[in-house]
């Protein structure tokens, strides 16, 4: 049978079809499609592809994205695990696609097709979609708007950090101090503000040594005048991390509570994308619906 597939160049057709899909998972599924020899199945598949073509011709092709497989993350969240920001971002992108497909299909109201059941099964979740989209900047950072508490903590860190910098700026600009410094700058070591002091003058700047240069010529000292303020900043940074973990946990729990409908939607989205990919390829090839 595989030899017959090769003679028919099925692999080349499937490769062309995969190029009309948007997500990697969908492309891989397309390449694994096998012909059916059941006439009812064949007729059903042709009808769905034909309906996708008709809808695309009237309303344009719905927008698909390169969504990632969200099933594993959704199941982990369902079991109580906190997800990574990357996993949450992928889920947010997926939920946006579900919303987009639902919006697109709303313009087709009143038109019944063999694809109607797929669209009507989609579970739009704007609350979770907006929560994730508004809270996450990147896979490494939450937005200040993720929670009022996070925003307040970060404002406090910013204010206290600015005060420490201003105090150290005065120190490094003082003529009596400059001769002890390797450079007139404020830098960071171990998350604390320090100044670069020449090793031979370490006793002239009272403070805590956090690091040395590769050559040993410079000590990075945290002046005693800012130790307490740096401690306060560190406490705030710990509070910030705890709040970040709380927010991620809250979003993960919400994802877990909707895991089953999301996994169902994921399969529906991939199925729809394949039918519209077939319709797009058919349009490009100026293909005609076969009569069986």
Each model region followed by its residue ranges:
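Alpha-helical coupling/stalk and coiled-coil linker elements that connect catalytic or binding modules
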Residues: 1-61, 77-82, 113-114, 129-292
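Long, charged all-alpha helical bundle/coiled-coil segments in cytosolic proteins
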Residues: 3-7, 51-122, 127
């Amino acid at each position: 049978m595989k030899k017959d597939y090769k003679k028919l160049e099925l692999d080349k057709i499937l490769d062309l079809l995969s190029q009309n899909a948007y997500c990697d998972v969908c492309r891989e599924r397309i390449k694994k499609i096998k012909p059916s020899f059941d006439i009812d199945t064949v007729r059903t598949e042709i009808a769905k592809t034909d309906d996708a073509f008709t809808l695309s011709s009237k309303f344009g092709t719905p927008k698909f994205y390169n969504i990632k497989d969200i099933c594993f993350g959704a199941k982990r969240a369902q079991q109580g695990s906190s997800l990574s920001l990357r996993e949450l971002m992928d889920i947010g992108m997926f939920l946006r696609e579900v919303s987009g497909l639902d919006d697109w299909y709303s313009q087709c109201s009143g038109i019944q097709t063999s694809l109607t059941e797929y669209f009507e099964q989609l579970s739009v979740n704007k609350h979770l979609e907006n929560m994730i989209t508004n809270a996450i900047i990147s896979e490494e950072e939450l937005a200040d708007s993720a929670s009022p508490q996070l925003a307040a903590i970060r404002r406090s860190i910013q204010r206290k950090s600015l005060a420490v910098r201003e105090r150290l700026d005065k120190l490094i600009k003082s003529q009596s101090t400059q001769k002890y410094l390797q450079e007139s700058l404020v830098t960071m070591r171990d998350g604390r503000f320090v100044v670069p002091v020449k090793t031979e003058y370490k006793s002239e700047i009272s403070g805590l040594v956090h690091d040395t240069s590769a050559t040993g010529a410079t000590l990075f000292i945290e002046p005693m005048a800012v130790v307490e303020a740096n401690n306060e900043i560190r406490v705030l940074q710990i509070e910030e991390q705890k709040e970040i973990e709380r927010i991620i946990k809250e979003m993960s729990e919400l994802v877990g509570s909707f895991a089953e409908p999301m996994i169902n939607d994921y399969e529906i989205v991939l199925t729809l994308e394949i039918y519209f990919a077939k319709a797009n390829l058919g349009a490009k090839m100026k293909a005609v619906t076969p009569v069986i």
